[in-house]
Design a protein with these regions (language model features):
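Cysteine-rich micro-motifs
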Residues: 1
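Polar/charged low-complexity regulatory segments
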Residues: 6-270, 279-353
Length: 353
């Protein structure tokens, strides 16, 4: 959706230009010595690939990747899974029916059912955080949990992945394609927007409007009118149930993920990222009261975004979000996940905090 800088996958003919753009971005981030080291690392990796391909042409893809990258296979596989999920979403969008009122009503029912399932999940009671507690830093990292889980990113610290060129380029590609962000200035502008305005303000406008026409310019085309009508109907359906502040999870969760991505790419320092996550943490704790409510907020905002995009594959998107949130709240059968369960939400603060 153009509203969030979310564009379709680049055509094959643009691959070379994209690769050059990634090099230019990295050139803006690193000094000459680091760029030389990066170029040397990439050259050595390319040499390894060419040599191994020549020696192992008879191997299958999985065996060849394992031979080439050894213990780095896990993070590379994560990148491939992310790309596969994006491809599946694009295929579903191509096969999905046109966006109409019937589909809209189905999505409302799906959202209500999914949010009810999230509400029924067990979660530890919120606990007090001291103002100078390390718990806030951990909480800030975990606010990126849904997108991190979908992308198989680490939630152990600020870094989302291991610092190897293939993953740095993959993250830069995600941020550029999904958000239209290519550097520090654009990153900070978007984080400011999400933390100060975002969908909280947008949803408020939709709730207050008496008709979709109040949201449009006089010369708006038919597509813009349909988009405004979908957003307005969404807000009118839910405005008595959810106040604008309920959108905080959707805004804060994405801002936290952008903060970690930006730090990973070197666009902001770790100290700057920690400060941004602190501010986002305070906003989340003020507006929401549990990880379940945070997850519900993310689903709520996610559907509004898909309605604005006119994406008929919105149901699949809600499924990805719900699965990620469930894994974070209760964990998986293999005992992984459960990061939100293991770090309870901050209890309401006393006066004088």
């Amino acid at each position: 959706c153009a509203d969030e800088g979310d564009t379709a996958a680049r055509q094959a003919a643009q691959a070379a230009a994209n690769q050059q753009r990634q090099v230019e971005i990295l050139g803006q981030i690193f000094d000459a010595d680091n760029m030389a080291q990066l170029a040397d690392s990439q050259a050595r990796m390319q040499g390894m690939v060419e040599q191994a391909v020549a020696q192992g042409a008879a191997l299958g893809t999985e065996e060849l990747m394992a031979q080439l990258f050894g213990e780095d296979m896990g993070v590379i596989a994560a990148a491939m899974e992310t790309l596969a999920m994006e491809d599946e979403s694009e295929d579903e969008a191509e096969e999905a029916p046109d966006f109409d009122l019937e589909l809209e009503q189905q999505l409302y029912r799906l959202l209500d059912e999914t949010m009810a399932r999230i509400e029924a999940l067990p979660e530890p009671e919120p606990i007090p955080y001291a103002k100078d507690s390390d718990k806030w830093a951990r909480f800030g990292i975990l606010l990126s949990g849904i997108v991190s889980t979908i992308n198989d990113h680490s939630l152990d610290g600020m870094d989302v992945e291991a610092h190897i060129p293939v993953m740095e380029q993959q993250v830069a590609s995600i941020v550029r394609r999904s958000w239209g962000i290519s550097g520090r200035g654009e990153l900070l502008d978007m984080i400011r927007y999400l933390s100060q305005e975002g969908y909280i303000l947008r949803y408020q406008f939709y709730c207050q409007a008496n008709s979709p026409d109040e949201l449009l310019d006089e010369d708006a085309d038919e597509e813009a009118r349909e988009t405004a009508a979908r957003a307005w109907r969404f807000a009118q359906r839910y405005r008595d149930q959810y106040a604008p502040g309920f959108m905080a999870g959707w805004d804060v969760g994405r801002a936290a993920m952008l903060t970690r991505w930006g730090c990973f790419l070197g666009w902001i320092t770790e100290s700057e990222a920690a400060g941004l996550l602190w501010e986002l943490s305070q906003k989340a704790a003020e507006e929401l009261h549990s990880w379940r409510e945070f997850a519900q907020s993310y689903l709520f905002g996610g559907l509004l975004w898909k309605l604005l995009c006119g994406d008929p594959a919105a149901a699949s998107y809600l499924g990805y979000l719900a699965d990620a949130a469930t894994n974070l709240i209760v964990g998986k059968a293999d005992q992984s996940g459960g990061e939100w369960r293991d770090h309870p939400w901050p209890a309401p603060r006393r006066i004088g905090f």
